[in-house]
């Protein structure tokens, strides 16, 4: 008996209206994500990766319009869901981590205040209970001195620590799905590896399902069980990561692999 996917996107078509002209950004995308796995969504800038991810919970800009398709998550039809119900899904069941935590975190509030806000909203915890959940979330992501970090402001943290804080906020409500959109791009190589290891750890310890969005196929090959390759708004290849990496079937995937630096070649 085959497993049902946690998230399934079918025939998604989405366009942007620019100065009276319609520009198609996603052209019939199909995607399945199964519970407890990391799926790498790979493609160059402008291929439609991020806008596909944002469409899952209706976080699209006003200029964007979903023309057709379906998005089902945990048995629920997200495209047909009222905004009020979608708000209950965001953060509680589906969380996002974006590329630059410096712009995602509010500079005038402490890390603790921002995590507590999410916990209070989605878990209905308050006071000492919300504080304890926030501290526990910082511990989960390997933040040193989590009690002290609760009182730190974003500008007082390094890039890697800010990203850990963002991930802590994202997992504080124990979502089923974490969408990480280029979470390592703004980080140096050493910190990048630490964040990737953290995503694998959270998947293992929490049973988290992860969509890892990146332009770098080498990153996906390190952590993801499945890989979907996106080009010009379409999923052109999907399968087990090892098979996609070792025996790509689409010319675009082959080109992405050719872009990966290899030892002994300049």
Feature map (PLM): residue ranges:
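A short, flexible loop at the N-terminus of ABC-type nucleotide-binding domains that lies
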Residues: 2-6, 15-28, 59-65, 82-85, ...
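The feature captures the beta-strand-to-loop junction immediately N-terminal to the Walker
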Residues: 42-43
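Conserved ABC transporter NBD signature motif
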Residues: 66-77
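A short, proline-enriched helix->beta-strand linker immediately N-terminal to the Walker B motif
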Residues: 172-176
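Helical segment within the ABC ATPase nucleotide-binding domain
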Residues: 193-206, 218
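A short, surface-exposed alpha-helical micro-motif characterized by mixed small hydrophobic
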Residues: 220-222
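ABC ATPase "signature
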Residues: 235-239, 247
């Amino acid at each position: 008996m085959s497993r049902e996917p946690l998230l399934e996107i079918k025939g998604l078509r989405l366009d942007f209206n620019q100065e009276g002209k319609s520009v198609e950004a996603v052209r019939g995308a199909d995607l399945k994500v199964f519970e407890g796995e990391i799926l790498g969504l790979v493609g160059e800038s402008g291929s439609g990766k991020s806008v596909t991810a944002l469409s899952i919970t209706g976080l699209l800009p006003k200029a964007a319009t979903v023309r057709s398709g379906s998005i089902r998550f945990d048995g629920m039809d997200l495209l047909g869901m009222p905004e009020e119900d979608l708000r209950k899904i965001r953060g509680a069941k589906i969380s996002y981590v974006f590329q630059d935590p410096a712009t995602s975190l509010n500079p005038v509030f402490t890390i603790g205040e921002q995590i507590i806000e999410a916990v209070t909203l989605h878990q209905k915890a308050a006071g000492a209970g919300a504080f304890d959940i926030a501290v526990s979330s910082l511990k989960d992501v390997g933040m040193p001195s989590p009690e002290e970090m609760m009182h730190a402001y974003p500008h007082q943290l390094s890039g890697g620590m800010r990203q850990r804080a963002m991930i802590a906020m994202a997992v504080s409500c124990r979502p089923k799905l974490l969408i990480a959109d280029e979470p390592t791009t703004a980080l140096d190589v050493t910190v990048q590896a630490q964040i990737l290891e953290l995503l694998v750890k959270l998947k293992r310890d929490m049973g988290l399902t992860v969509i890892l969005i990146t332009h770098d196929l080498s990153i996906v090959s390190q952590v993801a069980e499945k890989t979907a390759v996106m080009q010009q708004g379409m999923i052109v290849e999907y399968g087990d990561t090892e098979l996609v990496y070792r025996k790509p079937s689409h010319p675009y995937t082959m080109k992405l692999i050719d872009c990966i630096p290899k030892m002994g070649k300049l």
